[in-house]
């Protein structure tokens, strides 16, 4: 122990030659103790950094949840009775090969049953000398698809230094559009790709705080696929729906 070596060193304070070996031992003991202190400090810092990262991640997730709920409260559509929101993000629906100012901007929503894009932006209606003097707010549903019609989704990093997050969807037959390219803002595209995959496989049904109503599941499964009025194919029926409207003749079919 350092205390013992220190006592020996004090006892040999008048004997330089005899004190030298003790001094060497003491230096080694101090160096060893310093190494242990540094290791303990690194371990504590690591624990703190890990905890801080978890706190930051939790705060970020909480912020996303609050923002999603706020957007849903303002949305032009409503969730179905047994539908759960998973994620929402600011997005631009890229209509061509490259993104332009004419592409609709708004919010991309992912639920356990649907993929929804709502345009939500201020559009210039009047300019004076290239300066916008009047705007109008546009908010309307542009895309609404059952998650089962999502065949695939590709995530990609683009732009300078790969700081832009993009999602490219491929939709199945019966969808209103075959493809959908979205530039999302502020969230990771790879994370979104994983969330969409989980929604498609039904993983989120296992994590619900309130179990899925099996009666609603059976009602959706037993729903007609053809319109009883014109014989046209009806849109997919989602859990929680009470009626479905034929896109051909306009008849509302009660489930």
Model-derived features with residue positions:
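Anionic N-terminal interaction surfaces
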Residues: 1-4, 23, 27-109
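Cys/His-rich microdomains that often coordinate metals
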Residues: 234, 252-255
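Structured ligand/cofactor/substrate-binding pocket environments in proteins
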Residues: 112
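Long, hydrophobic alpha/beta structural blocks
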Residues: 5-10, 14-17
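Membrane-proximal, solvent-exposed terminal domains/tails of membrane-associated proteins
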Residues: 223, 233-237
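Acidic, Ser/Thr- and proline-rich intrinsically disordered linker/docking segments
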Residues: 103-107, 116-226
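Short linker/helix segments within small regulatory modules
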Residues: 236-245
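Short cysteine-rich clusters marking metal-coordination/redox-active sites
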Residues: 227-230, 246-249
């Amino acid at each position: 122990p350092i205390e013992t070596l220190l006592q020996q060193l004090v006892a040999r304070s008048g004997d330089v030659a005899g004190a030298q070996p003790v001094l060497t031992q003491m230096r080694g003991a101090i160096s060893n103790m310093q190494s242990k202190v540094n290791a303990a400090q690194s371990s504590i810092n690591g624990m703190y950094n890990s905890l801080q990262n978890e706190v930051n991640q939790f705060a970020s997730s909480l912020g996303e949840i609050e923002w999603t709920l706020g957007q849903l409260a303002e949305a032009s559509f409503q969730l179905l009775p047994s539908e759960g929101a998973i994620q929402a993000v600011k997005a631009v629906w890229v209509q061509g090969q490259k993104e332009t100012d004419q592409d609709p901007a708004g919010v991309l929503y992912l639920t356990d049953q649907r993929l929804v894009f709502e345009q939500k932006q201020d559009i210039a209606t009047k300019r004076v000398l290239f300066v916008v003097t009047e705007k109008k707010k546009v908010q309307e549903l542009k895309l609404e698809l059952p998650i089962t019609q999502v065949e695939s989704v590709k995530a990609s990093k683009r732009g300078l230094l790969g700081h832009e997050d993009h999602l490219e969807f491929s939709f199945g037959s019966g969808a209103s559009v075959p493809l959908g390219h979205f530039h999302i803002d502020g969230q990771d595209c790879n994370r979104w790709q994983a969330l969409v995959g989980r929604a498609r496989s039904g993983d989120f049904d296992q994590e619900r705080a309130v179990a899925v109503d099996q009666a609603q599941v059976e009602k959706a499964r037993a729903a007609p696929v053809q319109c009883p009025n014109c014989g046209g194919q009806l849109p997919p029926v989602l859990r929680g729906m009470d009626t479905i409207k034929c896109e051909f003749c306009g008849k509302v079919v009660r489930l």
